[in-house]
Amino acid sequence: MKRLLSWLTGLVVIAGLLIGLLVPPSVSAAEIRNVADDKLAERGDKVDLNNSSVRRFQQFPGMYPTFAGKIVLGGPYENVDDVLKLDLSERQKELFEKYRDNFVVTAPSIALNEGFDRINDGQFR
């Protein structure tokens, strides 16, 4: 009797393993998406005016930190040209026109604006 029970147990275990190998898990059927990665891919190498912190403007001489802060606090934007609706000096308008092709606007995302603090996003050198 013990021998029969051990054989049946073994068959059940082997059958379970085979079924597990043949039937893919439901997790692999639905691709897991990371919202932050999707948003970063959408903007490419450009600075997203609705989802970037002030630090992203360091690559543009004359914009960091004052003008960048004004842009960040003035959002959200519908399109890149909405920045020109801010109270800008002539110098700031010239800078914006100079770097305009480096900016993009996507919908604001909590994944990239955690804590809604885009002035000090906690990235320290």
From Swiss-Prot:
It is a peripheral membrane protein. Keywords: Electron transport, Membrane, Photosynthesis, Photosystem II, Signal, Thylakoid, Transport. Its main location: membrane. InterPro entries: PSII_PsbU. Residues 1-29 form the signal peptide. Disulfide bonds: none annotated. It is found in: Cellular thylakoid membrane. One of its GO terms (biological process) is photosynthesis. GO terms for cellular component: extrinsic component of membrane; photosystem II oxygen evolving complex; plasma membrane-derived thylakoid membrane. It comes from the Bacteria. One of the extrinsic, lumenal subunits of photosystem II (PSII). PSII is a light-driven water plastoquinone oxidoreductase, using light energy to abstract electrons from H(2)O, generating a proton gradient subsequently used for ATP formation. The extrinsic proteins stabilize the structure of photosystem II oxygen-evolving complex (OEC), the ion environment of oxygen evolution and protect the OEC against heat-induced inactivation. PSII is composed of 1 copy each of membrane proteins PsbA, PsbB, PsbC, PsbD, PsbE, PsbF, PsbH, PsbI, PsbJ, PsbK, PsbL, PsbM, PsbT, PsbX, PsbY, PsbZ, Psb30/Ycf12, peripheral proteins PsbO, CyanoQ (PsbQ), PsbU, PsbV and a large number of cofactors. It forms dimeric complexes. HAMAP family: PSII_PsbU. Belongs to the PsbU family. This is Photosystem II extrinsic protein U. It comes from Synechococcus sp. (strain CC9311).
